[in-house]
């Protein structure tokens, strides 16, 4: 039974991460009605920037997260410039940016496809250590809080 709970915790932790990317795809495809594939490359760009800053440079995880968000914003801006200034169709601009980001991500990572985060302090490990819980439990709590926050924010306001 404990093996099932550990697997469930891992699945929820990964689901939270992939859910963020799915929200980006949903916003561009459904709400903005633009076929934009940049989110695929920019999601990985943020992860690469954050991992390199935390592992190789020893930067605080919160600051690394903010820099990663800024890198994603720059990637989105490149897509926007390709679409508006150079008048490339949105789907093609997104695909061009996505393909470019694959190479850029490998360059950022120093030619490696991954970096081990096992011995590095992250946001989740800091939270887990502060409250005396495992990292999987901290991931689940963060995921639940984020999900409830997004549900609360996305609900339409009703006049009373």
Stretch-by-stretch model annotation:
Residues 1-21, 49, 56-63:
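Membrane-interfacial amphipathic/re-entrant helices at transmembrane-helix boundaries
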Residues 30-45, 82-96:
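Short, non-helical or kinked segments that cap or interrupt transmembrane helices
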Residues 101-130:
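Extracellular/periplasmic helix-loop junction at the C-terminal end of a transmembrane helix
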Residues 47-51, 102, 143-151:
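Hydrophobic core segments of alpha-helical transmembrane domains in multi-pass membrane transport
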Residues 58-99, 148:
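Alpha-helical transmembrane segments within multi-pass membrane transporters and channels
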Residues 52, 81-85, 107-108:
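Membrane-interface helix caps of multi-pass small-molecule transporters
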Residues 6-14, 130-150:
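Loop-to-helix entry region at the N-terminal start of transmembrane alpha-helices
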Residues 151-160:
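Single conserved hydrophobic/aromatic residue that forms the stacking wall/gate
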């Amino acid at each position: 039974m404990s093996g099932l709970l550990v697997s469930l915790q891992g699945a929820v932790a990964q689901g939270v991460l992939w859910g963020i990317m799915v929200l980006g795809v949903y916003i561009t495809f459904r709400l903005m009605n633009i076929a934009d594939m940049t989110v695929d490359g920019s999601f990985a760009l943020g992860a690469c920037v954050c991992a390199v800053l935390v592992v190789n440079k020893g930067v605080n995880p919160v600051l690394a997260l903010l820099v990663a968000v800024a890198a994603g914003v720059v990637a989105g801006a490149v897509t926007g410039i390709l679409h508006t200034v150079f008048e490339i169709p949105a789907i093609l601009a997104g695909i061009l940016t996505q393909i470019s980001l694959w190479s850029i991500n490998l360059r950022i990572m120093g030619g490696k496809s991954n970096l081990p985060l096992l011995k590095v302090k992250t946001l989740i490990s800091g939270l887990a250590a502060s409250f005396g819980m495992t990292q999987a439990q901290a991931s689940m709590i963060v995921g639940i809080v984020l999900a409830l926050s997004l549900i609360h924010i996305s609900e339409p306001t009703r006049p009373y």
